[in-house]
Amino acid sequence: MLEKLVDSLWKICRKSKFQHMTPIADAVDTFCFEPLHTPSSPPFVRDAVDVKRWMMLVVIALMPTIFAAVWNSGLQALVYQSSDPRIMEAFLHISGFKSYFSFVSQEIGIGSVLFAGCKIFLPLLFISYAVGGTCEVLFAIIRKHKIAEGLLVTGMLYPLILPPTIPYWMAALGIAFGVVMGKELFGGTGMNILNPALTGRAFLFFTFPAKMSGDVWVGSNPSRIKESLATMSSLAEKSHFDGFSQSTCLQVLNSTPPSVKRVHIDAIASNILNLEHVPTQDVLQTQFATWAESYPGLTVDQLSLEQLQNFVTTPITEGGLGLLPAHFDSACSLTEAVYGIGKFSTGNLFFGNILGSLGETSTVACLLGAGLLLLTGIASWRTMLSFGLSAFFFAWFFKIMSILTTGNAGAWAPAKFFIPAYRHLCIGGLAFGLVFMATDPVSSPAMKLAKWLYGAFIGFLTILIRLINPAYPEGVMLAILLGNVFAPLFDNIALKQYRQRRI
């Protein structure tokens, strides 16, 4: 029956007045069945895996990430808009799989989570395919060429890199810009130098920054979430710096001023975690000995919240740590991010129980997709490995240089440099970008050496933007797009090296 419908569509399009619609019939035929057309020029390769099957493997690799996006966005939305501080407290203090699924089943409901997540993700997916597909069809008709299968993956990647609160009209504008300016402008699928999905996101990021960063990570109605958070903080009698918020780990990292030093977060951590020894213990003890002369009987790791704030914000000349009082809340938030406390625990970051763009939250889901892409040979392991190693190395490098240049175990170096290197791999969009964006075969280099250089370049830029640039909390998007621009240069370098070895 399906074959008859496709044949009927071909008959209609072969009529003279509908011949310009032939690309649509060809696209439907190719999607449903094995394409009948053969290459018009060499090489002629007979293979069961054509471009359509190749793209379908990428779609299958995206399935774990899509499920994680639906599940996490639905759960976060229901918890954050509940206006119930008891539910929020229970959610933030989850530890382990057993307590996690017990909380979901007893407090929220699995069906409710999936339904809420689908309400957020599926409309964005539909818009991506509808608007992006329309642009593809129009250009195919105008240029009189076949509709390529590239949108099958681009249309699925695009909504996964958007915040859940993005307005629908804005999502449509972004995918249209990405397809037209990022791909069709260069000649269509296979000739674009930039990743179309990232091009669309970059356009939205620079055109509508307030809708792409800040408090945009929960539910589909930011105003409702803000009201719910304010209600929960009020009912729970939370202070201004320990109230409920929807800040992400990268937002905390980016918004922390340079005046927050390592010694400040170590002082807070020693009281929250009851650590017997922190890296800056000697500096803490020296300063505390002077400060505690007015408070006999106190120890540096057994302070009340008021005493801790007093010690950290007292001027250095009086025995304190010299932090501006207005920055104490930032220091508390960064302490959680650096030491993996509460919602920023390593488990939450790895498995995806965090806030962020729809597809970037779950590192383990991205790794499952990476396994399939590597197993089938679709993605380059060289790009993935060099990207990950480069990001890890430079995160570690900034930490070591901070210690060496300031002394005292980096006590007076900016605290943001001391987030563990492995945690950089689990926060933001690094895992998603590493697996699905940087490995785009069209916009990435082709030579083996070039792939190593390309991945290392992206990893370096990602960490540099995260830690040094105060304007952008995340560096993955810009790093990959810049890597796309430099990809021909990396190929040229690799080609010269290859020729020199052959001579």
Swiss-Prot record:
<comment type="function">
    <text>NQR complex catalyzes the reduction of ubiquinone-1 to ubiquinol by two successive reactions, coupled with the transport of Na(+) ions from the cytoplasm to the periplasm. NqrA to NqrE are probably involved in the second step, the conversion of ubisemiquinone to ubiquinol.</text>
</comment>
<keyword id="KW-0813">Transport</keyword>
<comment type="subunit">
    <text>Composed of six subunits; NqrA, NqrB, NqrC, NqrD, NqrE and NqrF.</text>
</comment>
<keyword id="KW-0812">Transmembrane</keyword>
<dbReference type="InterPro" id="IPR010966">
    <property type="entry name" value="NqrB"/>
</dbReference>
<feature type="modified residue" description="FMN phosphoryl threonine">
    <location>
        <position position="248"/>
    </location>
</feature>
<keyword id="KW-1278">Translocase</keyword>
<dbReference type="GO" id="GO:0005886">
    <property type="term" value="C:plasma membrane"/>
</dbReference>
<keyword id="KW-0406">Ion transport</keyword>
<keyword id="KW-1003">Cell membrane</keyword>
<keyword id="KW-0915">Sodium</keyword>
<keyword id="KW-0597">Phosphoprotein</keyword>
<keyword id="KW-0520">NAD</keyword>
<keyword id="KW-0288">FMN</keyword>
<keyword id="KW-0285">Flavoprotein</keyword>
<keyword id="KW-0472">Membrane</keyword>
<feature type="transmembrane region" description="Helical">
    <location>
        <begin position="55"/>
        <end position="75"/>
    </location>
</feature>
<feature type="transmembrane region" description="Helical">
    <location>
        <begin position="361"/>
        <end position="381"/>
    </location>
</feature>
<keyword id="KW-0739">Sodium transport</keyword>
<feature type="transmembrane region" description="Helical">
    <location>
        <begin position="120"/>
        <end position="142"/>
    </location>
</feature>
<keyword id="KW-0830">Ubiquinone</keyword>
<dbReference type="GO" id="GO:0016655">
    <property type="term" value="F:oxidoreductase activity, acting on NAD(P)H, quinone or similar compound as acceptor"/>
</dbReference>
<dbReference type="GO" id="GO:0055085">
    <property type="term" value="P:transmembrane transport"/>
</dbReference>
<dbReference type="InterPro" id="IPR004338">
    <property type="entry name" value="NqrB/RnfD"/>
</dbReference>
<dbReference type="GO" id="GO:0022904">
    <property type="term" value="P:respiratory electron transport chain"/>
</dbReference>
<feature type="transmembrane region" description="Helical">
    <location>
        <begin position="160"/>
        <end position="180"/>
    </location>
</feature>
<keyword id="KW-0997">Cell inner membrane</keyword>
<protein>
    <recommendedName>
        <fullName>Na(+)-translocating NADH-quinone reductase subunit B</fullName>
        <ecNumber>7.2.1.1</ecNumber>
    </recommendedName>
</protein>
<feature type="transmembrane region" description="Helical">
    <location>
        <begin position="475"/>
        <end position="495"/>
    </location>
</feature>
<keyword id="KW-1133">Transmembrane helix</keyword>
<feature type="transmembrane region" description="Helical">
    <location>
        <begin position="452"/>
        <end position="472"/>
    </location>
</feature>
<feature type="transmembrane region" description="Helical">
    <location>
        <begin position="384"/>
        <end position="404"/>
    </location>
</feature>
<dbReference type="GO" id="GO:0010181">
    <property type="term" value="F:FMN binding"/>
</dbReference>
<comment type="similarity">
    <text>Belongs to the NqrB/RnfD family.</text>
</comment>
<dbReference type="Pfam" id="PF03116">
    <property type="entry name" value="NQR2_RnfD_RnfE"/>
</dbReference>
<feature type="transmembrane region" description="Helical">
    <location>
        <begin position="417"/>
        <end position="437"/>
    </location>
</feature>
<dbReference type="GO" id="GO:0006814">
    <property type="term" value="P:sodium ion transport"/>
</dbReference>
